[in-house]
Swiss-Prot record:
Primary location class: cytoplasm
Listed name of the protein: Aspartate--tRNA ligase
Any one GO MF annotation of this record: transferase activity
Binding of ATP, residues: R220, D221, E222, Q229, E477, G529, L530, D531, R532
Species for this entry: Streptococcus pneumoniae serotype 2 (strain D39 / NCTC 7466)
Binding partners and assembly: Homodimer.
The protein's role, per its UniProt record: Catalyzes the attachment of L-aspartate to tRNA(Asp) in a two-step reaction: L-aspartate is first activated by ATP to form Asp-AMP and then transferred to the acceptor end of tRNA(Asp).
Region (Aspartate): 198-201
EC number per UniProt: 6.1.1.12
Length: 587
C-alpha cells in the first residue's frame, strides 16, 4: 500500500480521511482492551488505536505481538482524540487502525530511542543508526541540510561557481599532519587527503573562474576535542579582484541569510571588528566570547613597586575581576583553578577577595600600599574576587582567557540565546613554535602580508602582519580567510622566511610558483567550518552531534571498527610492510 503521508504530519484537517502510514513502533500500551501504539517516523509521532471490536482477530493478534522498533504499515481513519496531547504536533488526532502489517521485527535495542538517554558515546556510535532515530539527532541533521541549502542558494545568487577539487593531492609540510594514501601504481609514492582545497582554489582563480565555492570534506590527522574531527566539512570560498572588506561583506550576507532562514534571527550588519592584539589583551583569546564582560586588566605598572617579587619582577601582571563572586569560590575551588592555570604555562594563580572594603587573601598583605590605586584601576566593589597571573604576557593572557571562559560557565554568566559574531583582523603573519623551534605560518604560507610590514620578511618576522581575518561566534573560530599572494617573488620570499630552500620550495610548490608566471590575478577567500557552525546553531557542545557518522576521540569508528588492519596481499600490492611495536611483540 502506498504511504499517504508522514506520520508526524497528520493534523485535524485530515479527520475523517482514510490514510496509510509507515514507520517504527515507539511505544505500545494496552489499556481497557484497546492497544495504543506510538508510530514514529522522521517527521514525528502519531498515536494509533487498535480496537478489538473494529478489527479482525488476525489484526489484533499482530498488534499484540508488536515490540519497540518493529517496522509496521497501518491503514485506518483519522479521528479526533478525546483528550488532546498539547506536547505533540499530532496531539489532536489519532488513527483508528483497520489494517496492520509487520514489515520487519527488531531485537531489543541497547538504549531507548528517545531524547535524553544516558548511553555512553561509544555505545551511541557503535549503534549510530539507532542513535540517529532519536528526534534530537534527526532534527540536528535536518538543520544541517537547511544550512547547506541556504548557503548554496545564496552563493548561486551571487554567481559563485561550485567546483569540485581533488581528494587525492600532494602532501605539503605546513599545517597539521596529513592523512597519506599509498599509490599502487607509483610504488613508494603517496597522495595526501587535503587539509583544505587551498592551492587548488587559488589555481581556479588563475584559471579565471572569478568566484568559486564548494562545500567540501577536509582531513587533518590531529589530536581530537569536542569541536574537531579527523574529517570535517567546510564552506570554501575564493574570489578574484575583491578587497578584504568585499569578501567580509559577502560572508556576512551569507551568515545573515542562514540565521534568518534556519533560526528566524535577524543579525545586525556589519559585524564588529577587533584587532588581534586587542582580542588577546582584553579577552586572552584570538576567538573572544563577547557575550559577557570580565575583561583582562593589565596591572604591570600598578604593581611595579610592591614588595612581592612575583609581581614586581614579572614581565607582565594581569588580572580578571569576578564581580560579586567572593563567596562562590572557596580556597579549594581556587586551588582547582590554579591547576588549570598551570596547564596554560602559568607558575601559579594569585588572588584576593574584597571583604567589607578590605583586600583578603594570600597576597593581600603585599597590596595594602596600592589598595586605593588597585581599587580604582579594577573598579573593585565588595564581594569581588580578583585573580592575578604574573608571567610572560603570552602566558598571562592565555591563562586568564581560559579561566574567564570557565568561570563564566560555572556562574551562568553566558546568555546562550545570543549569537555574537565578530571579525578578528590585523593578524601576525607568523607564530613561534616551541616544538619546531622556528616561526610558522599563523594561517598558511600563501597569505598576503600587509605592504607596510612585508620588508620584515628578511628581518623581524614577529613584526610582519597579514591581511587575514577570522570570523568568530560565541568564543569559537567559525572560519578564517585572507587575501593571497599572487606575485612569484613575494611567494618565494615567504617560503624563504619559513625556512624553505629554493629547492625545497620548488619541490613542494613548484606548480604554484610556475602558475604565477602566467598572469595570476589578485585574489582572496575564506572557509567556514560547517560542522562547528551547525553545532552552535543547534545548541550542542560537540560536533559529533551534528555529523551523521563521526569518529570518537580516538579517531576510530566503533560501528565499522575503522581504521582496521588489511590483508597482507593488499599491503604487498602497495609495497608496504607494517612494523610491530614492542607492545605487540610481547603479547
Amino acid at each position: 500500500m502506498k504511504r499517504s503521508m508522514y506520520a508526524g504530519r497528520v493534523r485535524e484537517e485530515h479527520i475523517g480521511q482514510e490514510i496509510t502510514l509507515k514507520g517504527w513502533v515507539g511505544r505500545r500500551r494496552d489499556l481497557g482492551g484497546l492497544i495504543f501504539i506510538d508510530l514514529r517516523d522522521r517527521e514525528g509521532i502519531m498515536q494509533l488505536v487498535i480496537n478489538p471490536e473494529k478489527v479482525s482477530a488476525e489484526v489484533m493478534a499482530t498488534a499484540e505481538s508488536l515490540r519497540s522498533e518493529f517496522v509496521i504499515e497501518v491503514t485506518g481513519q483519522v479521528a479526533a482524540r478525546e483528550q488532546a496531547n498539547d506536547k505533540l504536533p499530532t496531539g489532536a488526532v489519532e488513527l483508528n487502525v483497520t489494517a496492520l502489517i509487520v514489515l520487519n521485527t527488531a531485537k531489543t535495542t541497547p538504549f531507548e530511542i528517545k531524547d535524553g538517554i544516558e548511553a555512553n558515546d561509544d555505545t551511541r556510535l557503535r549503534y549510530r543508526y539507532l542513535d540517529l532515530r532519536r528526534p534530537e539527532m534527526l532534527e540536528n541533521l535536518k538543520l544541517r541540510a537547511k544550512v547547506t541549502h541556504s548557503i548554496r542558494n545564496y552563493l548561486d545568487e551571487l554567481e559563485f561557481i561550485d567546483v569540485e577539487t581533488p581528494f587525492l593531492s600532494k602532501s605539503t609540510p605546513e599545517g597539521a599532519r596529513d592523512y597519506l594514501v599509498p599509490s599502487r601504481v607509483n610504488k613508494g609514492h603517496f597522495y595526501a587527503l587535503p587539509q583544505s582545497p587551498q592551492i587548488t582554489k587559488q589555481l581556479l582563480m588563475n584559471a579565471g573562474f572569478d568566484r568559486y565555492y564548494q562545500i567540501v570534506k577536509c582531513f587533518r590527522d590531529e589530536d581530537l576535542r569536542g569541536d574537531r574531527q579527523p574529517e570535517f566539512t567546510q564552506v570554501d570560498l575564493e574570489t578574484s579582484f575583491l578587497t578584504e572588506q568585499e569578501i567580509q561583506d559577502i560572508t556576512e550576507g551569507l551568515i545573515a541569510r542562514v540565521m534568518k532562514e534556519t533560526k528566524d534571527i535577524e543579525v545586525t550588519l556589519p559585524f564588529p571588528r577587533m584587532k588581534y592584539d586587542d582580542a588577546m589583551a582584553l579577552y586572552g583569546s584570538d576567538k573572544p566570547d563577547t557575550r559577557f564582560d570580565m575583561l583582562l586588566q593589565d596591572l604591570t605598572e600598578v604593581v611595579k613597586g610592591v614588595d612581592f617579587k612575583v609581581f614586581s619582577e614579572a614581565l607582565a601582571v594581569k588580572a580578571i575581576v569576578v564581580k560579586g563572586a567572593a563567596d562562590n569560590y572557596s580556597r579549594k575551588d581556587i586551588d582547582k583553578m590554579t591547576e588549570v592555570a598551570k596547564q596554560y604555562g602559568a607558575k601559579g594563580l594569585a588572588w584576593v577577595k574584597v571583604v567589607d572594603g578590605e583586600l583578603n587573601g594570600p597576597v593581600a598583605k603585599f597590596l595594602t600600599g596600592i589598595q586605593e590605586e588597585l581599587t580604582t584601576a579594577l573598579a573593585l566593589e565588595d564581594k569581588d574576587l580578583v585573580l592575578f597571573v604574573a608571567d610572560t604576557l603570552e602566558v598571562a593572557n592565555a591563562t586568564l582567557g581560559a579561566l574567564r571562559g570557565r568561570i563564566a560557565k560555572e556562574l551562568g554568566l553566558i546568555d546562550n540565546d545570543k549569537f555574537n559574531f565578530l571579525w578578528v583582523v590585523d593578524w601576525p603573519m607568523f607564530e613561534w613554535s616551541e616544538e619546531e623551534g622556528r616561526y610558522m605560518s599563523a594561517h598558511h604560507p600563501f597569505t598576503l602580508p600587509q605592504e607596510e610590514t612585508a620588508h620584515e620578511l628578511e628581518g623581524d618576522l614577529a613584526k610582519v602582519r597579514a591581511i587575514a581575518y577570522d570570523i568568530v561566534l560565541n568564543g569559537y573560530e567559525l572560519g578564517g580567510g585572507s587575501l593571497r599572494i599572487n606575485q612569484k617573488d613575494l611567494q618565494e620570499r615567504m617560503f624563504k622566511a619559513l625556512g624553505f630552500s629554493a629547492e625545497e620550495a620548488n619541490d613542494q610548490f613548484g606548480f604554484l610558483l610556475e602558475a604565477m608566471d602566467y598572469g595570476f590575478p589578485p585574489h582572496g577567500g575564506l572557509a567556514i567550518g560547517l560542522d562547528r557552525f551547525v553545532m552552535l546553531l543547534a545548541g550542542e557542545e560537540n560536533i559529533r552531534e551534528v555529523i551523521a557518522f563521526p569518529k570518537n576521540n580516538k579517531a576510530t569508528d566503533p560501528m565499522t571498527q575503522a581504521p582496521s588492519t588489511v590483508a597482507l596481499k593488499q599491503l604487498e600490492e602497495l609495497s608496504l610492510q607494517v612494523e610491530e611495536d614492542e607492545t605487540s611483540k610481547t603479547n
